[in-house]
Amino acid sequence: MTKRSEAKYKIDRRMGQNIWGRPKSPVNRREYGPGQHGQRRKGKLSDFGVQLRAKQKLKGYYANISERQFHSIYVEATRLKGDSGENLIGLLERRLDTVVYRAKFVSTMFAARQFINHGHIKVNGKRVNISSYKVRVGDLIEVKESSKQLAFVLEASQLAERDVPDYIEVDHNKMTAKFGRIPALTDVPFAVQMEPHLIVEFYSR
């Protein structure tokens, strides 16, 4: 198992949930956290603990976004019209690494970030190597021509464990994806329940 896989599955073990719905997640075999003391029964969480856990789970899902970056996204969400929790999800789904993952150009969020950083992705015909780049409605995301035949890209497009959400239009023959609209929480294909309202409560303390 690679270091990236270990880090990814460590998040699953810490949360006690298979947050990406991956068949190989260790929590499919056990329901306790990592380490030798992982099997100890956990006490009931305080309200703060529940809110913190919700934040950690959402941060972890999006490939362990740093606290500084996550809080910056939250602040932006509060400045937009509408529900701050819904806005938070919408902003996270507009990240380029999220769209690349959703389009099934790669198999994991972590791989999406690396794929972009290495210059394999174009947005509206121009190469973008910043994984946090904010995609706009109507943007066309595509895999660079020389990268389309990479084995892991071809394998990812065939993954049956997840579908492309309807707010992204994908042409797997051309390896392109059009960002159709900003999704609501209920549109996003999370494998586990996400509770952005608890994150709003956490930062509002």
Swiss-Prot record:
Q: Does the keyword NAD apply?
A: no
Q: Which GO terms describe its molecular function?
A: rRNA binding; structural constituent of ribosome
Identify the SMART domains for this entry: Ribosomal_S4, S4
Keyword GTP-binding assigned: no
| Segments passing through the bilayer | none
Cleavable signal peptide: none
Enumerate the Pfam families for this protein. Ribosomal_S4 (PF00163), S4 (PF01479)
Query: What InterPro entries does this protein's entry cite?
Result: Ribosomal_uS4, Ribosomal_uS4_bac-type, Ribosomal_uS4_CS, Ribosomal_uS4_N, S4_RNA-bd, S4_RNA-bd_sf
| Record-level GO BP terms | ribosomal small subunit biogenesis; translation
Cellular component GO terms, alphabetical: small ribosomal subunit
Q: Looking at the record, which segments are called Disordered?
A: 18-46
Alphabetic keyword roster? Ribonucleoprotein, Ribosomal protein, RNA-binding, rRNA-binding
Residue ranges of domain S4 RNA-binding in the record:
94-157
Disulphide bonds annotated for this chain are none
* Function of the protein: One of the primary rRNA binding proteins, it binds directly to 16S rRNA where it nucleates assembly of the body of the 30S subunit. With S5 and S12 plays an important role in translational accuracy.
* PANTHER family on file: 30S 40S RIBOSOMAL PROTEIN, SMALL RIBOSOMAL SUBUNIT PROTEIN US4M
Quaternary structure (record): Part of the 30S ribosomal subunit. Contacts protein S5. The interaction surface between S4 and S5 is involved in control of translational fidelity.
Entry's family note: Belongs to the universal ribosomal protein uS4 family.
Q: State the name under which the record lists this protein.
A: Small ribosomal subunit protein uS4
| Species this chain originates from | Rhodopseudomonas palustris (strain HaA2)
